[in-house]
């Protein structure tokens, strides 16, 4: 779990920005969004192959 220590006199906005960067780096928000709804294995497989095809076409 990411944490940020706020020093005396440090703006809260700066601490929030640092916290958001840490959360993005660890992928916590992305994982939470992916676990929000259940995806059937066939749907996951189809999305994965579609993403791979899109990547190959570049």
Swiss-Prot record:
Gene3D superfamilies for this protein: Ribosomal protein S8
GO molecular function: structural constituent of ribosome
Family matches, as InterPro entries: Ribosomal_bS21, Ribosomal_bS21_sf
GO cellular component: ribonucleoprotein complex; ribosome
Domain of life: Bacteria
GO process terms (BP): translation
Pfam family, one: Ribosomal_S21
Region (Disordered): 39-58
Sorted UniProt keywords: Ribonucleoprotein, Ribosomal protein
Sequence ranges of Basic residues compositional bias: 43-58
Family from the record: Belongs to the bacterial ribosomal protein bS21 family.
Name of the molecule in the record: Small ribosomal subunit protein bS21
Taxonomic source organism: Chlamydia pneumoniae
Lineage: Bacteria, Pseudomonadati, Chlamydiota, Chlamydiia, Chlamydiales
């Amino acid at each position: 779990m990411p944490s940020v220590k706020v020093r005396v006199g440090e703006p809260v906005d700066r601490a929030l920005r640092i916290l958001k960067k840490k959360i993005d780096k660890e992928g916590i928000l992305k994982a939470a969004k992916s676990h929000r709804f259940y995806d059937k294995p066939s749907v996951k497989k189809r999305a994965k192959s579609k993403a791979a095809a899109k990547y190959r076409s570049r």
